[in-house]
Curated annotation (Swiss-Prot):
Organism: Drosophila melanogaster
UniProt name for this protein: Heat shock protein 27
Region (Disordered) residue spans: 157-213
One Gene Ontology molecular-function label: unfolded protein binding
InterPro entries: A-crystallin/Hsp20_dom (IPR002068), Alpha-crystallin/sHSP_animal (IPR001436), HSP20-like_chaperone (IPR008978)
Residues recorded with modification Phosphoserine: 58, 75
Superkingdom to which the source organism belongs: Eukaryota
Similarity comment text for this entry: Belongs to the small heat shock protein (HSP20) family.
Compositional bias ranges of the Basic and acidic residues kind: 197-213
Amino acid sequence: MSIIPLLHLARELDHDYRTDWGHLLEDDFGFGVHAHDLFHPRRLLLPNTLGLGRRRYSPYERSHGHHNQMSRRASGGPNALLPAVGKDGFQVCMDVSQFKPNELTVKVVDNTVVVEGKHEEREDGHGMIQRHFVRKYTLPKGFDPNEVVSTVSSDGVLTLKAPPPPSKEQAKSERIVQIQQTGPAHLSVKAPAPEAGDGKAENGSGEKMETSK
């Protein structure tokens, strides 16, 4: 009897064991989602032929080297996923598929956007679990905190956006004043009325002085 089928079986069992535990520990809710990931949806993984259970579902397939990126993001390394800032303004996306919309809050404190997600203890495939995260994003200089908007998609991606600040040309207050055509100027322009009781003589006016005899 060949031992090759047994080797394949052992490899599959080891892979499923590592995968299930990896997904259990890889509860990466609240982390950023790269724009590239949004265009590569993950297929729902059905139970394999061995009947060893269903892997944890996440709506997006992570890009190559995701586990290394996760560790760098958690440590705040140089390759951490940062908000995108460009000509279209400020934008950041994050995976919140583990939370319902009413379990999320977004608020602005000064020029910082604070995102919080929390749900009470509930049962999942591994037991009881309670999730809570808080993420903060500082708006770049010039961005108006009052312009921040947030959306959450049906597949669990929260997006924060803020329009770009106005350019220097747009910041200047400019208004075109319409020129109206009128009749003779003396009919439309009023002469300024002199102020009463100011006690001052106007230019060219005479002043009579009385002397005592």
